[in-house]
Amino acid sequence: MANVYDWFQERLEIQALADDVTSKYVPPHVNIFYCLGGITLTCFLIQFATGFAMTFYYKPTVTEAYASVQYIMNEVSFGWLIRSIHRWSASMMVLMMILHVFRVYLTGGFKKPRELTWISGVILAVITVSFGVTGYSLPWDQVGYWAVKIVSGVPEAIPVVGVLISDLLRGGSSVGQATLTRYYSAHTFVLPWLIAVFMLLHFLMIRKQGISGPL
């Protein structure tokens, strides 16, 4: 093992990286509530793993979506557990995200020079809610269908561009296959890439600026 370590150390200076990670100063006022962001990240990683597992069996069509979800729940080995963990961690992720936002706000973590960290966090919150909206529709049951119907119809109240936005969300003038395809694409491809990018920016800024001081 020593030879392997020396080989990597010579080329990548991994000890310097390890020292930088493990020797970061943590202010004495930090408590358990400062872990809410990390818990949110953990929930997302669980979401990613369980969601990826379900893509092997889920069929994003209006005629097969519901049946494929039932197949996952009843026929796939541990499918019920994987989907249940996905749902539970989704709820936990939203809850932890909300508590994290409140903690940052109440402790003044949004103030100068951390404005950009706060903005990236707000964007991450919007993306998290978008995950919930798009994922809720994927079983394409009565609850999911009418949820999409309501959500996609809300923008119609916006003057001038409202109808255009609704048609963009639905993939047409009515809810159907195009809608499910768009929500599935957003849930499994667009939103994961967006949240990965903004998480990276968020963590890099936290790493650079450190944890904010007490009020």
Curated annotation (Swiss-Prot):
One of the record's GO molecular function terms: electron transporter, transferring electrons within cytochrome b6/f complex of photosystem II activity
Keyword Transmembrane helix: yes
Subcellular location: Cellular thylakoid membrane
GO biological-process terms attached to the record: photosynthesis; respiratory electron transport chain
Lumenal, thylakoid side: 53-89, 137-185
Cofactor: heme b; heme c
Residues reported to bind heme b 2: R83, H86, H187
SUPFAM superfamilies hit by this protein: Transmembrane di-heme cytochromes
Sequence similarity: Belongs to the cytochrome b family. PetB subfamily.
Entry protein name: Cytochrome b6
